[in-house]
Amino acid sequence: MKKTYHLGATAAFGLEGVVANELKRMGFDAKGFHGGATFDGTLEDAFRANLWLRAADRVLLYFGRFKAVTFDSLFEQNKVLPWEELLPRNAEVYVTGACARSQLMSVSDVQSIAKKAIVERMKKAYSLNWLPEDGARYHIDVHIHQDE
C-alpha cells in the first residue's frame, strides 16, 4: 500500500473554492481554506494534481507539523521526520521559511537549523559522513505560525 500524505494546493485570493471543486472532481475529499485547498493523497496523486489543476498555483506536501518554541525542539523534531522517504542520498536541500506570531522569529536561524536537522537525518539514514548535495534540488519550506 502506498503512503498517504496531507497535501495542499495554493491559490490566488478568491479561487480557493474553484481549486477545492477541481480537486473534488478529481476524486479527492478536498477542503478549502484561506489561500487554497487541502486534501490527502499519495505522491502520485500530488503529481496528478500538479498536472491537472487549472486554478491552483502549486501543490505542496505537508510533511510535518509540531510545536516548536526553542531552536533545540525545532532541530530535534525535524530530525525525527523520515526525510529519506522523500529525498535521495545526494539531494541538494534548499530550505526557505517564514515566521509569524511565534517565539522563534529569526527566519535565517529557522532555515539553518531545519537544514542541519534534515542533513543529520539523511546522513544517519544513508550511513554517510557528509551529504554530497550534488543531485537534484529539493525545496523545503518551513513555516512557523503561533509556535507550530
Regions found by a protein language model. Give the residues of each.
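Core structural elements
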Residues: 140-148
